[in-house]
């Protein structure tokens, strides 16, 4: 397969047999371009102490294509730091957040979801169904309706590792931007 050849010849990480979305990066990544102002924007947020990840998307209604154009990928920072990074990319952009944030705390008894709302973010709970999200992303990838700017290095690194284990279970490791991708597509 072409992606295996690239891995062996050029040392480029490849999508393996257990890849969640076995679509070569070359078919997904695009050179950055200026996004038209009229394209709707949204971001998706996956929160955590070790890693908080955010991905931003712009939607071209004319061709039903979603472009992921920037990312925030940082660990060990307070919600106020992440919120500032989110607002710096457009405080007017609405977002979706991992619904599990309603139950997570960084300090006694306070929900992360509420922390982000208090920081002024316009967020709603994302649909966190793995099956629904994986299928929705797969549908867009295989029809060329999900594209990712090449500048999203962390996204690319996670994409090539996102896989199912030998028993068919999703490997929940280094998948924060893949989670945000599911949230933003659904």
Task: State the predicted function of each range.
Residues 1-45, 50:
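ATPase catalytic-site recognition across NTP-hydrolyzing enzymes
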Residues 6, 113-117, 181, 185:
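Non-transmembrane alpha-helical segments in soluble domains
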Residues 13-14, 61, 185:
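Hydrophobic/aromatic-lined pockets within catalytic cores
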Residues 40, 55, 62-172:
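Mg2+-dependent endonuclease catalytic cores in nucleic-acid-processing enzymes, primarily RNase H-like
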Residues 45, 97, 174, 178:
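Single, functionally critical "micro-switch" positions that shape active/binding sites
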Residues 46-48, 100, 181:
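Anionic group-transfer/hydrolysis microenvironments
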Residues 52-57, 182:
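Short beta-strand scaffold segments in enzyme catalytic cores
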Residues 168-186:
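Acidic, Mg2+-coordinating catalytic module of metal-dependent nucleases/exonucleases
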């Amino acid at each position: 397969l072409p992606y295996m050849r690239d891995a062996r010849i050029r040392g480029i990480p490849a999508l393996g047999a257990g890849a969640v979305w076995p679509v070569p990066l070359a078919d997904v990544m695009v050179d950055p371009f200026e996004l038209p102002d009229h394209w709707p924007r949204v971001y998706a947020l996956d929160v955590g102490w070790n890693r908080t990840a955010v991905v931003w998307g712009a939607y071209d209604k004319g061709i039903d294509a979603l472009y992921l154009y920037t990312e925030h990928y940082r660990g060990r920072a307070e919600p106020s730091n992440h919120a500032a990074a989110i607002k710096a990319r457009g405080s007017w952009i609405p977002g979706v957040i991992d619904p599990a944030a309603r139950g997570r705390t960084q300090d006694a008894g306070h929900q992360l979801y509420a922390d982000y709302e208090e920081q002024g973010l316009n967020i709603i709970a994302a649909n966190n169904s793995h099956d629904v999200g994986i299928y929705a992303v797969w549908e867009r990838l295989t029809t060329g309706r999900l594209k990712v700017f090449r500048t999203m290095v962390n996204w690319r690194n996670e994409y090539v590792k996102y896989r199912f284990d030998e028993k068919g279970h999703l490997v929940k490791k280094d998948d924060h931007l893949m989670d945000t991708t599911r949230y933003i597509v659904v």
